[in-house]
Amino acid sequence: MINPNPKHSDEPVFWGLFGAGGMWSAIIAPVMILLVGILLPLGLFPGDALSYERVLAFAQSFIGRVFLFLMIVLPLWCGLHRMHHAMHDLKIHVPAGKWVFYGLAAILTVVTLIGIVTI
């Protein structure tokens, strides 16, 4: 018999953010680390492609703000979700662990949003 009042879970939302953050961390973050962390300091990047003025102009544009927001927030959600489930797997039960980890991720998301808007 089908339960007429099924219990709804909030877990799909967190798994979605975890998956998006993991994908972003695997595809976009290594490219940014290569470009900004290795090629640029070694002088292997062409000309003024990443000059201060160009990077600032990009960061202040709408698409730049969205990119910076996603670059910070998605890996953050992925990491905190992973920490929450790692603690559970190791049988370390944090009181109200879901509220601690996901609440911290939500607070840091709001802080990031405020920071990105004020650039």
Swiss-Prot record:
One of its GO terms (cellular component) is plasma membrane. One of its GO terms (biological process) is fumarate metabolic process. Pfam families: Fumarate_red_D. The chain crosses the membrane at residues 26-46, 55-75, 99-119. Gene3D superfamilies: Fumarate reductase/succinate dehydrogenase, transmembrane subunit. Keywords: Cell inner membrane, Cell membrane, Membrane, Transmembrane, Transmembrane helix. GO terms for molecular function: succinate dehydrogenase activity. CDD domains: QFR_TypeD_subunitD. The keyword Manganese does not apply. Its main location: membrane. It is a multi-pass membrane protein. SUPFAM superfamilies: Fumarate reductase respiratory complex transmembrane subunits. Two distinct, membrane-bound, FAD-containing enzymes are responsible for the catalysis of fumarate and succinate interconversion; fumarate reductase is used in anaerobic growth, and succinate dehydrogenase is used in aerobic growth. Anchors the catalytic components of the fumarate reductase complex to the cell inner membrane, binds quinones. Part of an enzyme complex containing four subunits: a flavoprotein (FrdA), an iron-sulfur protein (FrdB), and two hydrophobic anchor proteins (FrdC and FrdD). Belongs to the FrdD family. This is Fumarate reductase subunit D. The lineage of its organism: Bacteria, Pseudomonadati, Pseudomonadota, Gammaproteobacteria, Enterobacterales.
